[in-house]
Amino acid sequence: MLSRTVDSFDEMFDVVVVGYGFGGAVSALSAHDAGAEVLLAEKMPNPGGISICSGGGLRLPHDRDATFQYLKATNDGTTPDNILEAFMDEMVQIDEYVQELATVNGARIKRTERPGSYAFPGFDQMYFLQIDDIPDFDPKRDYAYANALSGGPFMFKVLQDNIAKRGIKTRLGVSAKRLITDDKGAVAGVWLDDG
């Protein structure tokens, strides 16, 4: 049984991100860009998680308030407004963020009108953003393990190249076994296993 507490650590990082798909990559980039020393750990031998096999697109708002009303309707009151407001505050910044990330490798961004899935007010105020081309990148060659047929590999390539450019440490083939806590129960680390 792995202990929940330890006397010392093998390595020290400000932030350890577990999982190297889209979410893990963006979390690692955000922590690094905020000044943290980051370790990005992935249990599989190759990065990408299931994200690399996804469509790789992001549905974004043309109109923040209309999209807020749409999301509020789709959640039918189950998500507090302050959570949806915080979500929208970040959602309206994603297009610019992806544009910035895409400069790392000259990725081409494609925007397509794509309304919401349900005919609630505001459903027609959204669009779809994807990476649809990267010079000298062939997803079937470069990510043969992913067997992806859609845009996921393109978005992941942009994220992976940004991770590499920033020199963020990554570990593949290591799994998180247990969180390590201090004597007050606060998380102080993570037990990673490469076996």
Question: PLM features: residue spans?
Answer:
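A short, basic/flexible loop-to-alpha-helix module at the beginning of a structural domain
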Residues: 1-12
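Acidic, glycine-rich active-site loops and adjacent beta-strand->loop/helix elements
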Residues: 21, 44-46, 57, 176-178
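Gly/Ser/Thr-rich helix-start
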Residues: 22-25, 49-50, 57-58, 190
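Conserved redox-cofactor binding core of oxidoreductases
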Residues: 89-195
